[in-house]
């Protein structure tokens, strides 16, 4: 059911009306915003529907919003949920576009210079460009971002200057359009038409906007007049619709007008001269020669091409900022009436504060030893006090607010009662001596009921040994650790939900915001070892992972009750009592959370398809040698036929099946 609110551009898809503590929380937060409170805190327990409350606040106030999360996995989960709540509004995703990133660095002790090396994810880059386009074009915009939002991107005023407006009936020579596209960092490619390129055929210019994944623009000219503007599918060429006007946005956040580049080059030359003089005065001749050689090469590239490798290190000169001024970031693109939500704020806020310090330490060596000019230090993330100055009206969202949120809370809004009636997990304390075998018997009980288990240990070594031990005893177990990349982490969590394994072991990766309703047992090993992994906040967060299940239970293995354990148990008990009183008063029978299993960024996973895949794998495992050989020959023939008929996708699918069968055949030959 789609709901609209007065003076709000948002259409909220409301699968159910707010319940439990949600109506009061929504009302208090909206009231706090209209009263002009700069900061508020939503203290919401796991499973109380904090994301739904955020969506309601955005829809009712009608203001654009940015939601910040502390990692890509949680940001992707929030993005997916917000897209469901706002199917007709601009919900965008802004995270770091690097799949791999090795920053430039110098290690003086080994005289080792490490070149910058990175691999950019095209899909995420397109989503980032789409995010800035939506902010500039639409009032109904919601951006889900990570701390990537505090890193410098192009100056909004330069970005605005570079936008190309096209309108039917307008006089614009073809040469001017091509020239503008080139300065916007679009490249001409008449053969391979992809994102960020354009092609020219007679009087027709086809432009593939950098922020679009499936729509291109065809500009048909009659002499110097724009005759028609048409949107079409770049793959099939099918016309989608004719438009009267269209705005083409730059191909990168870092585009710069030509006169700005020339002005910046003069400033860089000036800084270089001063720096060489300083090195010579200090007797550092190697550094003087190094900085001159590197900077002159970059200047040559800037004059000829308009950009160079590592152009971000000269960003201060391009944006015209003074030394030490904050860089332009995504937050500068936000309209003045924007809202900010900081999800899992007890982790996200400290993370924002830590970003600048790490970056500054690395840059200091590069500047000192002549690899970069001093202005490179101003290509940096925001300092915490700069971030605070830019923050619009902000709502901190957390089950366990930290000191910063408590000090800055205009009001604290509690959302402790769950609409589903689910009660916080029951907590049991058991001795450490028998923890491994005791947990094994509990796991078997859960496996028999088709439920899942999360186990948190203190060290990687303990997690690995535990995973090996349980595997030997016939338990399907996986181990989650910091070396696993974002995409694989999402897949592991999805596989746990699908039942491809029953137990997930981790260290501190099980804490914030993992939404796994199938988990009925959380086990915390060595719970009495005080430290940040066993602090009151960590324990409450970890216990909360079982709060989405009807039979949720938390086992704390400890020989004594620490202060942190006592506080976590008291807080959980307080929440249990409040929920049970609410259930009794309203006659609510608790029911488990049912949640579709989604591909966090691209939509919804088909459980049936996954199960079919598992069945197919099992069928392969059952084949004898003769059947296997026959099946391989049949598939090879089918694959060649598909390739001859130009059915390449089908051929690729068969090839993957063949690979699986050949692996099985090879293993059986051993």
UniProtKB/Swiss-Prot annotation:
Per the record, the domain of life is Bacteria
Q: What InterPro entries would the database entry show?
A: Helicase/UvrB_N, Helicase_ATP-bd, Helicase_C-like, P-loop_NTPase, UVR_dom, UVR_dom_sf, UvrB, UvrB_inter
Assigned GO CC terms: cytoplasm; excinuclease repair complex
Report the PROSITE patterns cross-referenced here.
HELICASE_ATP_BIND_1, HELICASE_CTER, UVR
Short sequence motif named Beta-hairpin, residue ranges: 97-120
Instruction: Cite the entry's keywords alphabetically.
Output: ATP-binding, Cytoplasm, DNA damage, DNA excision, DNA repair, Excision nuclease, Nucleotide-binding, SOS response
Gene3D superfamilies referenced in this protein's UniProt entry, alphabetically? 6.10.140.240, P-loop containing nucleotide triphosphate hydrolases (3.40.50.300), UVR domain (4.10.860.10)
Q: List the GO biological process terms.
A: nucleotide-excision repair; SOS response
Q: What does this protein do?
A: The UvrABC repair system catalyzes the recognition and processing of DNA lesions. A damage recognition complex composed of 2 UvrA and 2 UvrB subunits scans DNA for abnormalities. Upon binding of the UvrA(2)B(2) complex to a putative damaged site, the DNA wraps around one UvrB monomer. DNA wrap is dependent on ATP binding by UvrB and probably causes local melting of the DNA helix, facilitating insertion of UvrB beta-hairpin between the DNA strands. Then UvrB probes one DNA strand for the presence of a lesion.
What is stated about domains?
Answer: The beta-hairpin motif is involved in DNA binding.
| Subunit structure, as described in the record | Forms a heterotetramer with UvrA during the search for lesions. Interacts with UvrC in an incision complex.
Q: What is this protein called?
A: UvrABC system protein B
Give the source species: Chromobacterium violaceum (strain ATCC 12472 / DSM 30191 / JCM 1249 / CCUG 213 / NBRC 12614 / NCIMB 9131 / NCTC 9757 / MK)
